[in-house]
Swiss-Prot record:
Gene3D superfamilies: Phosphoribosyl-AMP cyclohydrolase. This is Phosphoribosyl-AMP cyclohydrolase. Zn(2+) binds at residues 79, 96, 103. It catalyses: 1-(5-phospho-beta-D-ribosyl)-5'-AMP + H2O = 1-(5-phospho-beta-D-ribosyl)-5-[(5-phospho-beta-D-ribosylamino)methylideneamino]imidazole-4-carboxamide. Its cofactor is Mg(2+); Zn(2+).
Length: 134
């Protein structure tokens, strides 16, 4: 059966679309990733976020190693049809591989000459504990 809805997405030259992941309820931006057609289809089928890992060159089911899956509540396409927004519930409140709630834990503070990036979110769990394989 043809999945015509996938054709509405404007995939880039590599067959990818940028994805913003936002926490349902708080509206916190948790992370940014990419999807290909298969990842978006699997996300819809599973009800959990599946991305395309550009470094591993394979589908990446978020939480497959850590258990920190993202339950998808809503999928939106932006006005240009070239960015996807996932509204999710983040299992165990950890979205970032650094053990933080959000991947956006560094905030610029200061001016153009003396400013710097400050860490503004705590580590909720040591990544060594998250990714230790039994």
């Amino acid at each position: 059966m043809a999945k015509k809805w996938l054709n509405k997405v404007k995939w880039d030259d590599n067959g990818l679309v940028p994805v913003i992941v936002q926490e349902a309820g708080s509206n916190d931006v948790l992370m940014f990733a990419f999807m290909n057609r298969d990842a978006l289809l699997r996300t819809v089928e599973l009800g959990e976020a599946v991305f395309w890992s550009r470094s591993r060159k394979r589908l990446w089911h978020k939480g497959e190693e850590s258990g920190h899956v993202q339950k998808v509540h809503e999928i939106r396409l932006d006005c240009d049809e070239d960015v996807v927004l996932l509204k999710v519930t983040q299992v165990d409140s950890i979205a970032c591989h650094t053990g933080r709630h959000s991947c956006f834990f560094q905030k610029f503070d200061g001016d153009a000459d003396t400013g710097d990036w400050q860490t503004v979110e705590p580590v909720l769990k040591d990544p060594a504990q998250i990714y230790t394989k039994p």
